[in-house]
């Protein structure tokens, strides 16, 4: 480089030398001239060679005034590693040096003259001459204008760290925002601006904090911004000269982002050289106690234009100190903000930041604006876009300070808790892209929100959660029982007078908050309006303790039984603090006593706020004196006033509640808290009036006549103490074997409300539970003679006495009972008498049948909906029954067709055919029809067509042939039955010949062979009926009812081979003990107050398979205890070839049985033979894959010890898969028999078989 000549003509030359043009790589002679006294501006000229310049033979090839450059930068590309680029308004001019030293010397010389051209005098030149760090932003542009505003020319715009000329491509935001073409990408310490060629104002100013990621590919560079950017989320794609430039842009921008992150730590950008930045991380804030936040000082909103000071940088250099900006766009490194003592190195803004800030802050900062600027941004935006009204408006709306204005709207932390005069204060929101701290971010935008938006303080993070435990009302609690935060987070404790989130700093807000309970939760925590100063008084230990307190107390704010039931109408229900709505919440916990020993006021006077919506249908919670206001449907088995016991399970019968407060759901029975409750059971009398439970609560044994559950809900309970259908949608799922507290059938809702539809819990059952009334079964007979889901178990509103607490869901064991039970005066339990007024009602209308809960009589696997539960009756069968009703003038019994099931279940129906079936006018009627419930006359049942894969064993007393004769329906007998084999027909059962795969094995006394022998096509299933003709037609109904309640219905299927043996052993079908003592369950104790319920027995032809426990049903013992226990295993009973019933005394486990020990417990006839009776007839069914037996155990009440089992006559097993067309109709058949569409083995006791 030639030395500048000393002659007068070259006095203004500062530097000369040969440099290359980047594109052509031609060397040219460049001359750098300073501003001359003659008025020539500082400029860079080049000549073709030095000779021409020295001889002045020609004008310079090109002259570039430095004042027209808005930026000068070092550059490098793939061809030239040492470039110096001058960016003017309309072009990009670069020179290439041969070495880095040469590049730097030229760069510094250009930078110095450029700064002078911007208005500096020689005295201030030292400011910009000191550091050439690769960026001229510190010493160029408007930054120094504040130091000396005498220069009259307006520089083109703010200086930038880096400037690249790019071509924005029509992709992403470039297309949507119409940013296409040649732009300059101008980088400052905090922003990136796109300045269109030949324009002074930035089209878009993006904060570095708005950049999600950036990267380059080949000669393309892209920037992805988030939704906090003024442009919204998207990408900018730009093309540059080559990949080197793109890489340089990527690295430089990434470095700027990293530097900003390191300095202010608002978020951590990508710390590696990857092409994307890290996601935003919320920083902790530095609190400066000496400077109150704007929430206390007051925030006067200043317009963004004020912070920009003008629409053009000219105003910043206009020489008016009064227009000094709180943070100029070049705040910290511009001419205005940089003190003369600072070297102005563009690469060391952070070192100058504190000094510059303190230098100007005290002297020239406007006090009202004091809160607005907490950080002097060392390289804050200085883009020409300072004048862009678009960027202003967008920044003001976005709250992220995306304009060239250095007021970052997001940097609200300064206004929140920062010290504006503290240069070292770090505002995490300074960069405004932290998406999670909108509370403070918008504060600078909307100062009026200061009173309502909690300052975001890192120390307060522990206390930013609302206390989830509502304390009981006490000296520390609000009127509605919410916590009074023991830790104030702000160092003060809340009192009921001050709403949550209020603080001394917000006294005005306090009043309204205290007035309205909703305001208690309007703010998330106390910190919502609290002054940071108070907050700072809180030690970290306070925060941690507070957080622990608020998290550990998750318990209700009331004593378990305390408080009036309903929610206070005056108080809104807080969504945060529940009262007891769940059993475990009702446990006796006293958080306040535990916490501070404070006494809670009388719980009865407390108004607890139940935060839960009542789930019961159509029932509004009513304030009452109930001990809890739980709105949940109790799932416990049975509760006499159980709502209270469930809410506070510990109070009564804690043994019924597990440690978590849940009601025990075990099938062993007695789950409900009211077990053992007698007529005087206090629980039955303490039903909360405000209970919104839809509960199946019935009173314990004897409680019927003593107490009526009082429910405020209109149709909750009838006078009988039974809940009315509207009371609940839930059904008690626990099979309570200990049914001494079972209540009368809730199906029968009492005289005042007989027509109620079944309780909604009925509709929540599987179809299999939607039982229909059994034909010909009187209500009492149904209740006493058929095992059913008892209301005692809370499962279904079935007619169930204490005896009928069987929770067996076996289809036929469930079936056969009327909802309304008629009790005889002879019934042992006094509570039965309560139902007597209701008993006489007839079940003669379809409406009643529909309104009552029909009970299933089958367990079928065919239905995917309830594979383990009995199927509900189908509508089509209802229609068929209605048609049959019309034909036979009988009450239509709606029995949907039995499912086509693979035959996985045994239908064990425990009922006893009583002589009462034939008693009274029923015996005299020619057609069996249920005219009154008192007459135990089975209604006709129409057999469905289709193959049935079930074997039904109907164990019940046989009916007289007269019945079948009276029905006039031909009874088909399968094959040649042995002489005397009595096929006991089902009452008026029209069996279509297409019924196929069905074989009735009628095992009855020879005398009872009144079955019509019309041969039908061979069936693959055996209808095995061991008929025991019930001759005791004249038995009094009282006796019958009593026997029914005490009868144990369990039968061991006996094959035709063992018919004689079975007949010989009265112990099998009710021996000397009286009422049938047969039990198909584990050690059924036949006690008078217990019934038996059926269990599913699987008979696997290939072998005994044990059924899943879900297919077993708990049994309730029957009345009489039988001495002989006959292990009745399905394997033994109907395994492979047939069933074996042995009356062995031993306890034997049969794996094929779906329960542990299936006991056939006949009468205590010690001489009962042990030999198994082979059920040959079952083989036909087994051939067809019959796995289960449907046992219809119809019990005969008046079984005398001398009575012996009928001699079953085994019909020959028919070929499998062949329909049984026997249209057998006997009105004497039990309704359970009526509903069995698959092979039924009826063990019926014939009166002739009495011994």
From Swiss-Prot:
Modification note: Serine phosphorylation of IRS1 is a mechanism for insulin resistance. Ser-312 phosphorylation inhibits insulin action through disruption of IRS1 interaction with the insulin receptor. Phosphorylation of Tyr-905 is required for GRB2-binding. Phosphorylated by ALK. Phosphorylated at Ser-270, Ser-307, Ser-636 and Ser-1109 by RPS6KB1; phosphorylation induces accelerated degradation of IRS1. Phosphorylated on tyrosine residues in response to insulin. In skeletal muscles, dephosphorylated on Tyr-612 by TNS2 under anabolic conditions; dephosphorylation results in the proteasomal degradation of IRS1.
Modified residues (Phosphothreonine): 446, 453
Extent of motif YXXM motif 8: 998-1001
Positions carrying Phosphotyrosine: 465, 612, 632, 662, 905, 950, 998, 1188, 1238
Locus of motif YXXM motif 3: 612-615
Motif (YXXM motif 1): 465-468
Residue ranges annotated as motif YXXM motif 2: 551-554
Cellular-component GO terms for this entry: cytoplasm; cytosol; intracellular membrane-bounded organelle; nucleus; plasma membrane
Comp. bias regions, Pro residues: 1207-1218
Family annotation (Gene3D superfamilies): Pleckstrin-homology domain (PH domain)/Phosphotyrosine-binding domain (PTB)
GO molecular function, one term: insulin-like growth factor receptor binding
Subunit note: Interacts with UBTF and PIK3CA. Interacts (via phosphorylated YXXM motifs) with PIK3R1. Interacts with ROCK1 and FER. Interacts (via PH domain) with PHIP. Interacts with GRB2. Interacts with SOCS7. Interacts (via IRS-type PTB domain) with IGF1R and INSR (via the tyrosine-phosphorylated NPXY motif). Interacts with ALK. Interacts with EIF2AK2/PKR. Interacts with GKAP1. Interacts with DGKZ in the absence of insulin; insulin stimulation decreases this interaction. Found in a ternary complex with DGKZ and PIP5K1A in the absence of insulin stimulation.
Function: Signaling adapter protein that participates in the signal transduction from two prominent receptor tyrosine kinases, insulin receptor/INSR and insulin-like growth factor I receptor/IGF1R. Plays therefore an important role in development, growth, glucose homeostasis as well as lipid metabolism. Upon phosphorylation by the insulin receptor, functions as a signaling scaffold that propagates insulin action through binding to SH2 domain-containing proteins including the p85 regulatory subunit of PI3K, NCK1, NCK2, GRB2 or SHP2.
Name of the protein described by the UniProt record: Insulin receptor substrate 1
Lineage: Eukaryota, Metazoa, Chordata, Craniata, Vertebrata
